[in-house]
Amino acid sequence: MVYISNGQVLDSRSQSPWRLSLITDFFWGIAEFVVLFFKTLLQQDVKKRRSYGNSSDSRYDDGRGPPGNPPRRMGRINHLRGPSPPPMAGGUGR
């Protein structure tokens, strides 16, 4: 790719693909990715805590408190009664 530096037109093919600036830029890119990844994990935790109200208003600051709701069960819903399933294939009731 052609670019201008100090009033001169230069071609990037003349530079080595493994120059030091490329390696350092790659390192800092990975470092910033790791930092932002962990920041997003921590910020979601802070948002959850804020949704329950101010910590000064809470009676349960030390982690104790009433238990939460039990986890929802996944699978079939057995408490609703619907029509019974059709009989197995077979005769006509003779």
UniProtKB/Swiss-Prot annotation:
Transferase recorded as keyword: no
Tissues where the protein occurs: Highly expressed in heart.
GO molecular function, one term: identical protein binding
Region: Disordered, residue numbers: 48-94
Transmembrane region(s): 20-42
PTM comment text: Cleaved by CAPN2/m-calpain in resting macrophages but not in activated macrophages. Macrophage activation up-regulates expression of the calpain inhibitor CAST/calpastatin, resulting in inhibition of CAPN2 activity. Truncated SELENOK proteins produced by failed UGA/Sec decoding are ubiquitinated by the CRL2(KLHDC2) complex, which recognizes the diglycine (Gly-Gly) at the C-terminus of truncated SELENOK proteins.
Originating organism: Homo sapiens (Human)
Protein name: Selenoprotein K
Site residues by UniProt (Cleavage): 81-82
Function: Required for Ca(2+) flux in immune cells and plays a role in T-cell proliferation and in T-cell and neutrophil migration. Involved in endoplasmic reticulum-associated degradation (ERAD) of soluble glycosylated proteins. Required for palmitoylation and cell surface expression of CD36 and involved in macrophage uptake of low-density lipoprotein and in foam cell formation. Together with ZDHHC6, required for palmitoylation of ITPR1 in immune cells, leading to regulate ITPR1 stability and function. Plays a role in protection of cells from ER stress-induced apoptosis.
GO cellular component, one term: Golgi apparatus
Record's keyword terms, sorted: Calcium, Calcium transport, Cell membrane, Endoplasmic reticulum, Ion transport, Membrane, Selenocysteine, Transmembrane, Transmembrane helix, Transport, Ubl conjugation
Superkingdom, taxonomy of origin: Eukaryota
Biological process, per Gene Ontology: calcium ion transport; endoplasmic reticulum calcium ion homeostasis; establishment of localization in cell; intrinsic apoptotic signaling pathway in response to endoplasmic reticulum stress; macrophage derived foam cell differentiation; neutrophil migration; positive regulation of defense response to virus by host; positive regulation of interleukin-6 production
